[in-house]
């Protein structure tokens, strides 16, 4: 036991100036806390025992097509719909003026029937240029890290694990270029979420969609690797 050598004082430390705290280099070095968006979301997922299941996997040998994930929470059912398409290297840009992407995806409230799927397939790849459905809670798009993606597929197809150094340089297979919510481009308003049990926390629907995107990215590289070399292909080590 450690005994205090003197009285405990309740002296508040002065707040640092905003100009210091908000420096980009300083912000980039902050470690996640219990209040971080991702940690709050994954804690809710665990405590409420959310279940995410792939219920539709329609990709060709090169990994293009559509995939549907079902999300069951304690309160409701949602789906994340992903569309993967081929684009040239010249079309791949993270600039806001881009009009085509490797992936477009969204988080949908409720079931996805044939009519809704047809509407999403027609409009979601267009993003802001499309007529988006009001049951969409999140609308997003992403581009590949071509270097990482190709390296991961090649390694898995050869029966090996990718070199971790690739992730040290760019720690992703896909990077989102925009993640829209709260009524943007005609999707559901925040009023649909704020009184519910699932997505009342800030940015939680957006983080959920991106969480499923990460799961899709792994499933896609494994799928392509299996088609490239069925005899040797392995799955990605979860530690990566």
Task: Name these PLM-found stretches.
Residues 1-2, 73:
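Gram-negative host-targeted secretion-system effectors, predominantly Type III and Type IV
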Residues 2-24, 99-240:
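Mixed-charge, Lys/Arg-enriched low-complexity segments
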